[in-house]
Amino acid sequence: MTNLQDQTQQIVPFIRSLLMPTTGPASIPDDTLEKHTLRSETSTYNLTVGDTGSGLIVFFPGFPGSIVGAHYTLQSNGNYKFDQMLLTAQNLPASYNYCRLVSRSLTVRSSTLPGGVYALNGTINAVTFQGSLSELTDVSYNGLMSATANINDKIGNVLVGEGVTVLSLPTSYDLGYVRLGDPIPAIGLDPKMVATCDSSDRPRVYTITAADDYQFSSQYQAGGVTITLFSANIDAITSLSIGGELVFQTSVQGLILGATIYLIGFDGTAVITRAVAADNGLTAGTDNLMPFNIVIPTSEITQPITSIKLEIVTSKSGGQAGDQMSWSASGSLAVTIHGGNYPGALRPVTLVAYERVATGSVVTVAGVSNFELIPNPELAKNLVTEYGRFDPGAMNYTKLILSERDRLGIKTVWPTREYTDFREYFMEVADLNSPLKIAGAFGFKDIIRALRRIAVPVVSTLFPPAAPLAHAIGEGVDYLLGDEAQAASGTARAASGKARAASGRIRQLTLAADKGYEVVANLFQVPQNPVVDGILASPGILRGAHNLDCVLREGATLFPVVITTVEDAMTPKALNSKMFAVIEGVREDLQPPSQRGSFIRTLSGHRVYGYAPDGVLPLETGRVYTVVPIDGVWDDSIMLSKDPIPPIVGSSGNLAIAYMDVFRPKVPIHVAMTGALNAYGEIENVSFRSTKLATAHRLGLKLAGPGAFDVNTGSNWATFIKRFPHNPRDWDRLPYLNLPYLPPNAGRQYDLAMAASEFKETPELESAVRAMEAAANVDPLFQSALSVFMWLEENGIVTDMANFALSDPNAHRMRNFLANAPQAGSKSQRAKYGTAGYGVEARGPTPEGAQREKDTRISKKMETMGIYFATPEWVALNGHRGPSPGQLKYWQNTREIPDPNEDYLDYVHAEKSRLASEGQILRAATSIYGAPGQAEPPQAFIDEVAKVYEVNHGRGPNQEQMKDLLLTAMEMKHRNPRRAPPKPKPKPNVPTQRPPGRLGRWIRAVSDEDLE
């Protein structure tokens, strides 16, 4: 997580900024990585109360821009009247191009009294409406509270002196940058001409069927007959466009129509009026078209628009009183609100109504808005921008917290005093290491703790050695959410989810889909779809897992298991390795949900939970045990794992179970044991030694068992127990020293148990090995894959590479690592391996070879982009470069391979010219010609600079052009007689003689004569 302040505090800046915007902005930790700058903008307004003492403040809490809201005063006739818009202190479009809102909060209160008033009267109602402003049906003081049923989105009768606080909470996390409607360079004859670039993302479109064979009939009146053809609700506070057409038909000669569109504000007044048609004559017997094509810029929308109206005025040329006028109309139009569907742009809205406040009082609106801003090119020259950091843990934690905001008491509207008191609680929510004292007092502690455990990086930061717990998301999170989690199809995830394997080439592991498993601990025998009843526990038990601690202080023995996937019975593929602990008793609550409900019996009839119910374990135990996966071992504790691991099979844990049954240690034994006990008390060898050894070493443990392990205990059980420190109990009861002989016909269960040893040479396995060798001889790629696997196995990093593959499913990180790895002959290679690295001469490729490699890289990159004609040979003929824009356009239009070194300029649009002003050219010429105080640049030099701007289509000089201009300036300065005279060179400083030290007042200086 980001922004660590000290060892005890770990803050999530984004959620802190959301809940407490006054603490400042923070980058949104999503995957939209744009260089931006963070900025806090304040909004402060003193609103004067009208004659009725009532008013309404409309806030747009999620609007990504300068608009904050609007203020309306209630008139004596019961209607609202628009007062003014509420904006941020700075006009953002003047300096910035793009914006994302991070957080916002606003406070409304009154603390001033007009003359003659001695008491502060009035109350406030506030509500957050999950809709647009035009959709409100009752905006009266009391009716406002019926806009929502959510108790956390409304408050009533708050004293105006106490005030209310409006908090902006995100409604979506899929947020892109929004164009702010900033001005763009343009030249026009009209001095008021303005050109802006508005947002075109996520528009809101209203489609209105204005008329469907509507019949109009009336008698002639002087001045015409006016009707409202339609009126519809729309919402707009940014630029909009209106398009469409109406078709009129008439049988009356000389009819004249006029059409006017009105955009009406929330108070019912016309904000914008546009005449669509004036004195438009209709021709009898034909279709008369009336097109609509209107653009309304943001600058003309001075208050929120909530409806649109179209009026038709009908008249008749030379008409007389009593003349009949009739026509019919059909058609529709569309109103497009630019950026209207961006989350938070028009919905939700927060309305704050005040009532019975003294006339002339001042209602203060103050708040802060935090933004991510991308500056315009001029400001970007002097403003440093930075990339946002993608932090999935912080983003996941924020989403989890806000998804439970109703249960956690997080509101959108607050009494100001209550919001101030909750700031300490918000700090606890944002601090991942806080003890949640205040949250516990409110009863929110258990919820927040559960969300912290689900949020992946949080567990790793609370318990640094518990980083592997980060893999518990996915299916594990779905299990923890219990029966409330559902898949996209609507069915429970527990019945439809599948765990993912290491990469796309390995088949997905079936967990709960058919209540079976294909994850085995050996490479010899795979059960054929054994039925496992009750893999998933009840939802109540699963929800209880929220309260489990990660650390368990209990005696245990440890053993590693290699988990593999299988395509069929003879083609296994290694996937992962995991450490398991043997604990005494029935402890299914410590197991992951995927392992619960499954057990196997021993020869004595006792159960071992966590094993697949296939056969019996060839052990005689005196009690019941549970096998649980773990992620680490501390001094006297083990760290449990919630990875969705199915029940295990095989005999890797026999030695650990036997040791646990005999000695029953009080603390975990810090040695991993592996081996299978047979009927003669001997410990048989196992496979995947290096993989299990690497698993043990990763946890800081040694591995014990037969073979070349850290602790070579031999193949005899008696020798094994003598080399371990233990506290023997019931020493005379060691059934493994004198295990009775079991005949071969003891039954299928014993045969399966004996066959479950992890590795045995069989004819089938030998045949499979020969088949792989034959395939490697034929397929070089398969040979390379086997070589890589052998290299991983020899170095003991198979498990590490498998875990890395799980975290890098698309191999992006691996490709970047290989691309940036030091090559033979590089400086880092010579520094590490000397002049010959890896046993070969450390020299780089030849120029020809390097050029061929470059051509190949360019070709592969083009191939990933779907440009298949750019083969390495074509790239070499094209001057060792990729296709130009003209070549790409030629290929896209003709689907023919373009000729190398042919630019096809006819297929490329000419670059648009942009004029540069004389002032801009003069400033550039002055800056290049010399520093301030020197001679002004001559006209000839200004003309040279103007030529550069003309060549560059209005842009400044590049580096080469700048060098030429500097040389030209130097030549002109030497030829200019009016140039400033050169400054004289400073004379070297001659050190002065050091004055004699000051003698005391009564001390006489000693001369040479005195010394003689």
UniProtKB/Swiss-Prot annotation:
SUPFAM superfamilies registered for this protein in UniProt: Positive stranded ssRNA viruses
Q: Does the keyword Protease apply?
A: yes
Q: Which GO terms describe its molecular function?
A: metal ion binding; serine-type peptidase activity; structural molecule activity
**InterPro entries in the record:** Birna_VP2, Birna_VP3, Birna_VP3_dom1, Birna_VP3_dom2, Birna_VP4_Prtase_dom, Viral_coat
Region annotation (Interaction with VP1 protein) maps to 1003-1012
> What's in the keyword line of the UniProt record?
Capsid protein, Host cytoplasm, Hydrolase, Metal-binding, Protease, Serine protease, Virion
The molecule here is called Structural polyprotein
In which organism is this protein found? Avian infectious bursal disease virus (isolate Chicken/UK/UK661/1989)
